[in-house]
Amino acid sequence: MKTLNMKPNSTKGFLFTFCGLDGCGKTTMLMRLKSDLEKEHGVFLTKQPTNAVRTSDIFRTYMDCPDHDAYDYRSLSLLAASDRLQHGSRVIEPRLNKGDIVISDRYFYSCLANLRARGFENDDWIYEIAGAVIKPDAAFFFDVPVETAVKRVRSRAAEKNRYIDMDLQYRLRTEYISICKAN
């Protein structure tokens, strides 16, 4: 796997990112970190992709439907990557320039893991885009067994009946681990 050559963080602030499978504990841990840090620092909490992508037809199709033939997954990856670039330059970077600590629930690593887990490991464009993305000061990956993550997701009332592709979850976990080793 190639290394992501992200843009160094040259701001006064700090960027911490949290990635992993749905149900791995990211949100719980980032909320704890936020609670501890905001006692003494300006903290800005965000998530990627933003709601603009999360509410789009293409995103909802992939999240809620077992039939993924309606779209080429790379189109969703490009949408998510463009959202991350826009969000990074217009939201995250200004907060970092102010000296804030920015904590992101998911980041560019999630886009890469999802693309690779779906069989597009040779698509170089994702690595080129990474050059315009700020490298986090610390990136956390939460690794739990797939079964544990899925059980946690299913325990949420709103996601009790959500479609989950178990094979994809195993591949995602493998890709996250590979990304951690390469970066």
Whereabouts are the PLM-identified features?
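Hydrophobic anchor at the beta1->P-loop junction of P-loop NTPases
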Residues: 18
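Walker A/P-loop
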Residues: 27
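ATP-dependent small-molecule kinase phosphotransfer cores
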Residues: 41-131
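A glycine- and Lys/Arg-enriched "phosphate-lid" helix/loop adjacent to the NTP-binding pocket
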Residues: 111-174
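A structural motif corresponding to the C-terminal end of an alpha-helix
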Residues: 134-135, 178-183
